[in-house]
């Protein structure tokens, strides 16, 4: 799965960059996309709908804090996402950039069954403005193939 991850070409891949990549890419792929969607427990960064499938997406990005900040942002994103998991008919995802710090953070979850158990997808934004999706069942293989 490593072929999908591309090195970032941005100096700092901010949350707004991740959201921008996903909005453009999802729309190009035929998804209906809304941002800042009000839910029962706050706002989701993005909602995407296509062919009867609905995703609620919480996006996180980099700041100048390096690995520690990426780890904190990722964990905060997971908490926000879990608080918004109120509709069993929707799919839920955390989005982040394919930067070394975020990939390294993800490696801490290699032995965790949480993504599969909670059915959480990964939406990963690349520096070339492309994106890809990792389904919950494929996350361990993705982590294993993207060692930093």
Q: Where are the model-predicted features located?
A:
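Histidine-anchored nucleotide/phosphate-binding helix
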Residues: 78-86
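Active-site-adjacent loop/helix micro-motif of nuclease/hydrolase catalytic cores
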Residues: 64-77, 102-106
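Structural signal for conserved beta-strand scaffold positions within catalytic alpha/beta enzyme cores
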Residues: 35, 58, 94, 122-124, ...
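Conserved catalytic cores of phosphodiester-cleaving nucleases, focusing on short active-site segments
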Residues: 46-48, 52-66, 84
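Acidic-basic catalytic patches of nuclease active cores, encompassing PD-(D/E)XK
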Residues: 1-40, 49-52
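Charged, low-complexity C-terminal accessory regions
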Residues: 121-148
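Nucleic-acid nuclease catalytic cores
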Residues: 85-128
């Amino acid at each position: 799965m490593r072929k999908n991850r591309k090195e970032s070409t941005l100096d700092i891949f901010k949350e707004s960059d991740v959201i921008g990549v996903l909005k453009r890419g999802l729309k190009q792929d035929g998804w209906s996309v809304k941002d800042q969607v009000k839910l029962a427990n706050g706002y989701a960064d993005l909602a995407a709908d296509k062919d009867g499938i609905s995703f609620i997406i919480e996006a996180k990005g980099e700041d100048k804090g390096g690995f520690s900040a990426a780890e904190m942002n990722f964990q905060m994103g997971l908490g926000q996402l879990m608080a918004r998991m109120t509709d069993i008919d929707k799919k839920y995802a955390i989005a982040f950039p394919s930067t070394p710090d975020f990939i390294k953070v993800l490696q801490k979850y290699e032995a965790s069954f949480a993504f599969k158990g909670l059915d959480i997808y990964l939406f990963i934004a690349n520096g070339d403005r492309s994106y890809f999706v990792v389904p919950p069942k494929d996350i361990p293989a993705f982590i294993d193939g993207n060692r930093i």
